[in-house]
Amino acid sequence: EFRRVLFRSFIDAAKKLQAKGVKEISVVSETITTHEYESKTLAKAFEEITGIKVKHDLIQEGDVVEKLQTSMQSGKSIYDGWISDSDLIGTHYRYGKILPLSDYMAGKGKEWTNPGLDLKDFIGTSFTTAPDKKLYQLPDQQFANLYWFRADLFARKDLQDKFKAKFG
């Protein structure tokens, strides 16, 4: 009974989807431990709770990027959902082919969005938000980014002047 109450919105949404003929959804992600867990454990739990099967393809990162770009260029997606690194947010935003998640959750996806979902519970939404201030995906897994640069080159006045002349 606890499970039923806890997952009420998933169960209710699943019933509506099943009434529309949805029996399976397909998603793709790169092959890393986090996504292997999602594929093996969370997909199974989702099916047990909702009755909707999740087909979760695990492929190499480069293949995810290639398939995603092909889908954006063609306007046809072979997957219902994509789990991609947050550093692709710029690509999602620039192509203009991805519906921002924040727009979807507030608009036509509102009936499918768990009313208990609080985006403040997620760490890293700044990494999955584009320059238009819209959220394009929920942060799934994050890793520290470290950028190296040569301070001696940045300190050179001649290079600073060239940069300023070119870029303002």
Region annotations inferred by a language model:
Residues 3-97, 108-117, 158-167:
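Conserved N-terminal structural module of periplasmic/extracytoplasmic solute-binding proteins
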